Amino acid sequence: MSRMPSSFDVTERDLDDMTFGERIIYHCKKQPLVPIGCLLTTGAVILAAQNVRLGNKWKAQYYFRWRVGLQAATLVALVAGSFIYGTSGKELKAKEEQLKEKAKMREKLWIQELERREEETEARRKRAELARMKTLENEEEIKNLEKELSDLENKLGKK
């Protein structure tokens, strides 16, 4: 049996339909360098703050410099990712049109599948009705043959 189309076939959810956490995960998967840069920058700030508290100004200065460099690298990754993965308004509208066409095609396929199933069901009903009628005819014929046989036996028994 062929795979049936379903109204639950969803390939990609729209960003508007996602929760806040799902959106964060989606964007982190799309541009993995940005969250890595954020984590490294945060680590550099924490180490710098720890060394400031301990009074080690040389190491604190060292980690603050790392923070600046990591923050710059994160911004470069963010801009580069936006440039690479960014889409214009026309591309978004084209994608929307494709999704609408795909939805219409799915609906059309679903209707065709339902019509095919209906035809199969109707054919099965007709076959079942024909089988019932044939069974009734055969039962009547069997009764007639049994009656004829009993008549013949009675004739033979009388002679």
Swiss-Prot record:
The chain crosses the membrane at residues 14-30, 36-57, 64-85, 89-106, 134-156. Residues 88-159 form a coiled coil. Keywords: Coiled coil, Membrane, Mitochondrion, Transmembrane, Transmembrane helix. Disruption phenotype: Increases frequency of mitochondrial genome loss. Promotes reactive oxygen species (ROS) generation. It is found in: Mitochondrion membrane. Present with 1210 molecules/cell in log phase SD medium. This is Respiratory supercomplex factor 1, mitochondrial. It comes from Saccharomyces cerevisiae (strain ATCC 204508 / S288c).
